Structures are given as structure tokens and as C-alpha cells.
Amino acid sequence: MKKLSTALVAATAALAMMAEGYQVNTFSAKQEGMGHVGVAMKLGAESQIFNPGALSFMNKTMEVSGAMSAIKATAKADVDGTGYETSNKVSTPMNFSAAFRIYDNLYAGVTLYTPYGSSINWGKSWPGAVLNQSCDLKVFTVQPTVSWRILPKLSVGAGLMISWGSVDLKKGLVPASSMDKLVNLQYEAAMLQYKAAQLAAMIPGTPAPGEAPVKTGYTYGNMPPASVGLKGNSELALGFNIGAMYDITDKWTVGASFRSKMEMKVKAGDASVEYADEMARATLGSTLDNLNYANFSAQMPCPYVLTAGVAYKPIERLTLAFDAQLNGWGTYKNLDIEFAGLEAYNQHLEKNYKNAMTYHLGGQFAMTE
């Protein structure tokens, strides 16, 4: 009989995402409701993502599943007592999985999912604009998987991750404070010229100077006078996903999995420069417009993920699960953006992320047999 289950949410996705950066864990609606647990659970075709070793515990000849989530996240920042908030669009992480039996103890499958991605929009004018105004990052992975149940209670599995993605990043290119200083220097230089002309006018036959330059008092505030848009597609990246599962008893199951690090590399992305106003264009355009005709290269990591967990069935219809996950963000030291033939404009952005632990606790109750 088809089972009807309800999730007992014990750890929310929001808490997990704080330490997961641009990692995506919303691989199925069921697991999202359960706080993203899954490494010690027998999830059928979806096990290819959470723990490839669990796939060979599938009790069907063939299974196909799919899920899509709609996420609208919000981030806030407080800078010197002023609050700032993102205006993000809806993101739609998804997965589609299919698996089939080869032998009673050998299963294979393939899954398509989005392990990493981010959509954030701080707007053009905020104190961190020179680092990030907006970013739309997408990573897709196709993973063929094989799982072998070595013993009745022990199974292992492995999958080859074939990944590609795209990035659309906008950031300030020139700090607003630098432009304010430049405008002030231009005014002071104009005043020196005007005063020199006044002195020269004291000599008979020398024409009087025109009107004195006027200091507008205008400042760019948090608005970078020039911003750069970077858009590109990554090359294929390869990684692996391995896992194991063991039934200690009929009630207790343990599992572990490891997804390797991948480097997403853009080798020939497109750059475009946008100016805050005509004064910025007139002042900076002759220097920065060359970027509109340059390609950029960059790379960023999809860090490794090590997960271990336990599942417990206190009664037949109730399953409780706990996962501990180590996210290898320590591999993200910096982001280097290099422009072909225009090395003077290369960007070196320090990241220095730290490894982070996340903990997931959830459960489900089967309402029917």
C-alpha cells in the first residue's frame, strides 16, 4: 500500500544554510521538510545524492523521482547603524533521479541535481558594492552511480560527478571614495588655474579670467562610479561521490558519504562596464572602456562535503535521523579575476573562508501501512 508520511521538522533549512554558503541541500521536498537529513536513510533513487551506498537497499526493480524547490532568501547587513537588505529573485534548485536493479545486490542509476548555486542582489549602492552588487551562480551535476550490497546489512556505492555551471557577477570597479577624492582634486586644480589667471590679469594687456569654478559638494556616497559585469560559463569539472551504509540492527542504521571538491573554471567570460553617471563616464571612460572588449578568466571551488549520520526506528512507522556535515569551505581562499591583455585591471579578492559544521535532525511518520 502506498505510504503517506509526514515530516517532523527538527532542524530548519535556514539554520543549515548559514554555514553552507552557496552549497544547495534542497534535493527533495521530503528531505527539506526533515531538515536535510538523508545519509543514513534508504531513499531509493534519491540516495545517489545523499549516500550512493544506500542505493542497493532499494526494494524496487526501477524507480524514478524528481523534485523542485522555490527559495527566496533574504540577507541583511548593518553598517554603521544603517541597515541594508537584499532583493533576491526566486531560485529553483531541483533534482531528477532514476535507478534500476541489475542483480539482487547490485543497483545502478543516474541523477541530475544542483549541488551549488546562489542568487543575491544587494543593489548598486551599498557599502559592500565594491565587493558584490549582485551574483547569480548556477552549478549542475550529472552523476552516474553504482551501488553494491556486499553483505545483507552492508553496502557501498560510488558516483562520478560531471558538473558545469554559469556565473553572472556585478561588482564595483572603482570605490566611491576614490572618485570623490578625484573630483575634489579636479576642483582644486581648477581653482589653482583660476587664481593663476587672476594674477596674470594684473599684467596690462592680459585678459581677465572667466568665472571661478564652483564646488558642487556632490559625493558618490556608496555608489561606485564604475561597476563591472562579469558573465561566463564554466568548463566541465569532474568529481566523485562515495558512500557506505550499515544496518546495525533492525532499528539502527549508520551511513557516511563524501563528495569531493571541484573547481569551476571560466576561461573566456565577457566583461562590461557600467557608469553611475555622465561625469563618471567622462572621467573614467577613456581608461576603463577597454574592459568592454576583454575576456576574463576566474575559478571558484565547489568544496568537499563529508557527512556521517544515524537513523533510528523506535516504532515501525516512525523514523528519526541525525546528520553531521563538514563543509570544506577552507579551500576557498581567494577569488582571482584576470583580464586577458589588461593585467592592470585584475582583481584579487580575499575570501579566507573557514570549514564549517552543520547538523541536521529530522524525522518522518508513516500515517498508513
Residue positions per predicted region:
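Gram-negative bacterial Sec-dependent N-terminal signal peptides
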Residues: 1-19
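Enrichment for repetitive, rod-forming helical segments
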Residues: 9-10, 37, 266
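Hydrophobic alpha-helical membrane context
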Residues: 14-15, 63, 155
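Outer-membrane beta-barrel porins/channels
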Residues: 20-33, 60, 77-85, 91-369
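N-terminal targeting signals for Sec/Tat export/insertion, comprising classic cleavable signal peptides
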Residues: 31-48
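Short strand-turn segments of transmembrane beta-barrel domains in outer membranes
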Residues: 36-39, 63-76, 83
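N-terminal, post-signal-peptide region of Sec/Tat-exported proteins
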Residues: 45-71
